Design a protein with these regions (language model features):
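Beta-loop-alpha module in the N-terminal Rossmann-like domain of NAD(P)-dependent dehydrogenases
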Residues: 50-112
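Hydrophobic residues in well-ordered beta-strands that form the structural core
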Residues: 52, 95, 120-122, 246
Length: 336
């Protein structure tokens, strides 16, 4: 049984806390937020002690697993301090995405976890679904063959004022980039163009061409300008033996074998299937707890801190490309 704590009791923090209360291998023992009103309300809701200091919470409650769901500038600047404090206290950490808006902080967190032998995961919940696993199984079973290309699209409507001109790239695309690398491996180079939709002061829509280290090519479109009534996510992966399309996280995955006109389809079932976006959080959080509880090695963590770091590195390469007028940027050259 893993003793768990959630630090950062906003909307996402409540989802993490709820998921821990529903996990057979976890016990939620405390919540924490530096805003006392939020901490107290969450403590009362979940029936656990509350704290306003993460460091004091770790010392008092001795958790095994800590969720870091704080926000900050560009939705991630407040991840670093409570994460490092958790590692210093000997805790395994599941952090929200993006891992950090500062690649130097992200690198330090990943390296600290590795040095201390602690498990570090990032909430890449968009691919923690039965549909994504089915698509991956088709690939692992050789149904796709040698990789050719990957096309990814992710968009939601987010029209409020945001922190920075690159907020959309940094906050949304850890999901899309991680999905592409999950199926196709590390991204080698990118070329990105971005635009500010009418009335907006941020780069709210972008288009990226890329090459993977294995030679396959890809494309990513993302936007904060599409209203929420539309389907929001689509990943297409093609190879020499077949192609699959993985849609809306949990809704459907379709395999198109190269040598037949008959396709295979996984459709989320009405009974016992995913019912809402929350289910992706529950699946991802429970997967992390199960791995920690089973004694998995840090390098075996699915959706690891290193994956989060490499997704953000790609995004920072995309940003540099935008700044350089769409120039091709080598991902390995990006360190901050």
């Amino acid at each position: 049984m893993q003793r768990t704590v959630v630090v950062g009791m906003g909307h996402i923090g409540h989802r993490h806390a709820r998921a821990y209360t529903e996990c057979e291998q976890a016990q939620l023992v405390a919540v924490c937020d530096r805003v006392e009103e939020l901490a107290r309300a969450a403590g009362e809701k979940f029936g656990v002690p509350y704290f306003t200091s993460a460091k004091e919470c770790y010392a008092a409650m001795q958790p095994d697993v800590v969720s870091i769901t704080t926000g900050g500038y560009e939705y991630s600047s407040d991840h670093y301090e409570p994460t490092m404090q958790a590692f210093e206290a000997g805790c395994n950490v599941l952090g929200e995405k993006p891992i950090s808006n500062d690649l130097r902080h992200a690198t330090e967190m990943v390296e600290t976890a590795a040095r201390l032998g602690l498990c570090y995961g990032i909430d890449m919940n968009h691919r923690f679904t039965p549909a994504a696993r089915q698509a991956k199984k088709w690939q692992d079973d050789g149904r796709i063959g040698s990789l050719l290309f990957c096309n990814m699209a992710l968009w939601i409507g987010k029209f409020m004022p945001l922190d920075s001109v690159y907020y959309h790239l940094k906050a949304l695309n850890p999901h899309s980039v991680n999905i592409m690398q999950y199926f196709c491996g590390p991204i080698k180079e990118v070329s990105t163009f971005a635009m500010k939709a009418p009335g907006r002061d941020i780069y709210s829509t972008q288009s990226t061409a890329m090459r993977f280290e294995n030679g396959a090519v890809g494309h990513l479109t993302s936007s904060y300008d599409i209203k929420r009534g539309h389907p929001m996510e689509r990943c297409e992966v093609a190879g020499t033996d077949g192609r699959f399309v993985f849609e809306d996280m949990w809704r459907e995955a379709t395999l198109y074998p190269a040598e037949t006109y008959v396709k295979e389809v996984y459709t989320n079932p009405i009974f016992d299937g995913f019912e809402s976006f929350y289910d992706t959080f529950r699946d991802r959080i429970h997967a992390f707890v199960r791995q920690v509880d089973a004694g998995c090695k840090p390098e075996e963590i699915d959706g690891s801190g290193r994956e989060g770091l490499e997704a953000s590195r790609v995004i920072h390469a995309m940003i540099r490309s935008v700044e350089e007028g769409g120039a091709v940027v080598q991902v390995k050259d990006i360190t901050e």
